[in-house]
A protein has these predicted regions:
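Short gly/ser-rich loop at a beta-strand->alpha-helix junction or flexible surface loop bordering the NTP-binding
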Residues: 46-56, 71-116
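Short beta-edge/loop segments at beta->alpha junctions of small alpha/beta modules
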Residues: 1-75
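Residues at alpha-helix termini
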Residues: 41, 91-94, 145, 178
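Short coil/loop linkers at secondary-structure junctions
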Residues: 30-31, 94, 181
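Amphipathic alpha-helical interface surfaces
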Residues: 31, 83-84, 134
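A short, charged helix-loop
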Residues: 116-124
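Hydrophobic alpha-helix position signal
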Residues: 38, 87-88, 175
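Hydrophobic alpha-helical interaction segments
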Residues: 125-196
Length: 196
């Protein structure tokens, strides 16, 4: 009977898919024992308590879980935006540091988590942008300026000189929706200085 249940569970698993324990509960009457056996034999890999990956083989070995699927299962929501602080380098403001932590804006969790070998810092926010535009990236840069390795004054000087290259209305809307109070204040100051 146990072998029949294990076979049914194996047939249910899809390579590259991420599962929560609750996704598999209907397949077994003794789920924890069967999950342990599937992990021990390599059919599943435990990522976090209650979170599992069905490994997918590639020509380079085991492929990591697709980030979007992983975060969606972990958060139990698709309202999130993941980015790397390395993306700030694309703004042309003089940021050059490389970071090995991904940032996830979401409405559920806050803190540092290790998932599938990757470090993620989850920021809980009331509003989460749907996509990472240049203007949203500027707002995120200002929101997290104290955490960056670069000198804040140098970044602010670069930003004030580059401000005309951004869509002003979209930047102010993004700041209003996703920015902290100090980010909104700083952008208003820049805006009034440029228009004066």
């Amino acid at each position: 009977m146990a072998q029949h249940t294990l076979n049914r569970m194996r047939n249910h698993l899809k390579p590259g898919a991420v599962y929560r324990r609750c996704d598999l509960v209907e397949l077994s009457t003794n789920l924890d024992r069967h999950l342990k056996k599937l992990v021990d034999e390599g059919s599943l890999r435990k990522l976090k308590r209650g979170l599992y990956l069905c490994p997918q083989k590639s020509s380079f070995g085991e492929a990591p879980a697709e980030e979007k699927k992983l975060l969606k299962k972990f958060l139990r929501s698709d309202k999130f935006l993941a980015y790397s602080p390395n993306t700030f380098n694309s703004l042309g403001l003089g940021t050059t540091q490389l970071y090995n932590v991904r940032t996830v804006l979401n409405q559920k969790r806050h803190g540092l988590f290790l998932l599938n070998g990757q470090r993620y810092f989850f920021h809980r926010r009331t509003n989460v942008p749907k996509k990472l535009t240049k203007e949203v990236l500027v707002v995120e840069l200002l929101n997290n300026m104290k955490k960056l390795a670069e000198d804040p004054d140098d970044l602010l000087d670069s930003l004030s000189s580059q401000l005309p290259s951004f869509d002003h209305a979209n930047l102010m809307r993004s700041a209003e929706k996703y920015g902290t109070y100090s980010t909104q204040k700083k952008l208003r100051e820049f805006s009034s200085a440029t228009s004066a």
